């Protein structure tokens, strides 16, 4: 046997053994998952397939849909995005686009009818940006959390920035905001997005010290740090009680109270009575650095240092103006702004943190617009390796005593693998099925063990997602068990924006007490014995939109697949334009690399 044959044969044996270990571990974990399901987890599974087979239950859900949307025709828009980065010898081009598919669901007939609509000729079918950034200015766009000494050249610096993914998020959020903000006659009542909104919300909390946009002109004034604090205090909803008075961000609660009081001062007694926090604790919180930038205490009254409503209005205007220049006017200089550096004015490119801040503004504006216009906002994530349900949510609820302390063996590695393994083994489950919703705040909470004691802590220190804002769940929309090996679609991840008209009964759930984070008041949707109409409506609508016409995306809503088609089609067209852009640099010898010049001379 030759050396090459021995190498290949050794690799084959190693691969075979690794595969055997993987399959044995997966089979063992799947058996543990089934036992956990039989002992407890079955209480968190909702068999919507059986519910929807009951005509009486379907009529109740349709009645709730009519009551919520105030119509029997539900216009929707599905939004997906795409992005890329194309490196050339002197510059890199970032491309980002978002594409929307419009349609309507008619619930007058059973089964409901689905109709797609074409965009009118005077509307853009997409939102596109292509931004060429020279390597000479790479220092502005690099992410500030990496070690520069480990990067070889400017091209790798920009590669690490991942600014194109931030631009794609900005495009998707802006398109959704535009759709929600449109005329009340034509605006959708259901917005579907192909991303996890709760994850985006968490990722945009980058820290005030890393945002360089402060100083950017807004009309006759400039954006200040305190404007950023007002942005992160939003969204406001008094019926949902958000923002809450969590220990590390109580100033946001005060900003909401003063805004709801039309900018008038609020006395400390009102704070104490409304939040059940002692006066000493409030005084201590109001003397923190961020709080002192926003408010001041005078004669037991809390006075705003500036107009919070005007500040929020200006921040939204900045988001709208920059996005209009970037995505509609295709102005690459929309991402360039003046900064003062050592007493002189220079122009710099926006960093990923700056764009994340714009995404934070847009997402909060989108949320408040959806509440104002009674729009259901759903986001779908296809691929995720997270364990927010099995580790974070169940772990924290077990520690607080809400869920029983049932011994559990090793489970499959991710939430999706856990639930898909259960769906394969439990014949009684019929699609669609879903787990009970849980508050997105559990994404940032987990249980740690310290000195033999279990402590509930934040995953990112004291940065915790806003509770009572998004409800997360996992669901499956296609599972056919005709053969021994079932034909099934992947479990997908669903985020639903909470709405006071649907979710008020679930706001008085168990409190989570933490010495580091204070008291957290999440929404709690109970077990499958509780009827959650918000989730029932969203799953029913998604089931109507999941036609299973395309085998490559079976069990996935068709409008989002069509939006993905549209986004990829736009990308293919723009790719040709971008690749042709280097022609302008070929006539400039100084811009060409030594290797390029040498290789071009054939001798």
Predicted features and spans:
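Long, contiguous domain-sized segments
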Residues: 1-62, 67-69, 153-603
């Amino acid at each position: 046997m030759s050396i090459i044959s021995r190498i290949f044969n050794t690799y084959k044996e190693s691969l075979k053994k690794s595969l055997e270990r993987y399959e044995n571990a997966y089979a063992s974990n799947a058996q543990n998952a089934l036992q956990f399901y039989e002992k407890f987890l079955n209480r968190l599974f909702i068999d919507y397939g059986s519910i929807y087979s009951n005509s009486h239950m379907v009529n109740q859900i349709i009645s709730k849909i009519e009551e919520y949307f105030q119509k029997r025709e539900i216009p929707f828009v599905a939004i997906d995005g795409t992005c890329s980065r194309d490196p050339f010898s002197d510059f890199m081009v970032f491309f980002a686009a978002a594409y929307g598919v419009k349609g309507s669901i008619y619930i007058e007939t059973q089964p409901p009818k689905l109709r797609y609509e074409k965009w009118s000729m005077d509307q853009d079918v997409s939102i596109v940006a292509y931004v060429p950034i020279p390597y000479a200015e790479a220092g502005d766009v690099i992410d500030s959390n990496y070690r520069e000494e480990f990067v070889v050249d400017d091209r790798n610096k920009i590669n690490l920035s991942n600014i194109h993914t931030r631009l794609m998020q900005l495009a998707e959020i802006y398109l959704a905001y535009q759709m929600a903000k449109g005329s009340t006659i034509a605006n959708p009542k259901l917005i579907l997005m192909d991303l996890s909104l709760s994850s985006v919300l968490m990722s945009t909390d980058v820290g005030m010290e890393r945002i360089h946009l402060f100083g950017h002109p807004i009309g006759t004034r400039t954006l200040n740090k305190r404007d950023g604090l007002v942005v992160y205090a939003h969204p406001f909803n008094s019926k949902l009680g958000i923002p809450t008075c969590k220990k590390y961000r109580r100033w946001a609660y005060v900003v909401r109270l003063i805004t709801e009081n039309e900018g008038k001062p609020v006395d400390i007694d009102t704070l104490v009575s409304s939040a059940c926090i002692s006066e000493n604790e409030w005084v201590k919180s109001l003397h923190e650095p961020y709080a002192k930038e926003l408010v001041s205490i005078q004669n037991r009254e809390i006075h705003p240092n500036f107009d919070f409503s005007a500040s929020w209005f200006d921040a939204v205007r900045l988001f709208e103006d920059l996005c209009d220049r970037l995505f509609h006017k295709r102005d690459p200089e929309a991402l360039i702004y003046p900064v003062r550096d050592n007493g002189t004015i220079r122009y710099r490119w926006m960093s990923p943190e700056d764009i994340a801040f714009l995404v934070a503004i847009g997402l909060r504006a989108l949320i408040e617009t959806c509440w104002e216009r009674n729009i259901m906002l759903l986001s779908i994530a296809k691929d995720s390796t997270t364990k927010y349900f099995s580790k974070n949510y169940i772990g924290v609820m077990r520690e607080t005593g809400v869920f029983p302390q049932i011994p559990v063996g090793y489970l499959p590695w991710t939430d999706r693998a856990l639930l898909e393994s259960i769906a394969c083994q439990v014949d009684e489950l019929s699609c669609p099925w879903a787990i009970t919703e849980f508050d997105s705040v559990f994404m940032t909470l987990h249980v740690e063990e310290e000195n033999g004691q279990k402590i509930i802590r934040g995953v990112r220190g004291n940065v915790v997602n806003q509770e009572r804002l998004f409800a997360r769940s996992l669901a499956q929309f296609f599972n056919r068990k005709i053969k021994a090996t079932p034909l099934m679609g992947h479990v997908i991840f669903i985020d639903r924006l909470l709405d006071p008209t649907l979710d008020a009964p679930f706001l008085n759930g168990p409190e989570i007490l933490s010495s580091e984070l204070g008291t957290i008041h999440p929404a709690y949707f109970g077990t499958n014995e509780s009827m959650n109409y918000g989730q029932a409506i969203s799953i029913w609508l998604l089931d109507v939109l999941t036609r299973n016409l395309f085998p490559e995306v079976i069990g996935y809503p068709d409008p989002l697949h069509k939006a993905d088609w549209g986004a990829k089609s736009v990308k293919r067209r723009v790719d040709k334009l971008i690749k042709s852009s280097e022609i302008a640099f070929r006539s400039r010898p100084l811009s060409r690399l030594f290797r390029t010049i040498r290789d071009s001379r054939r001798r």
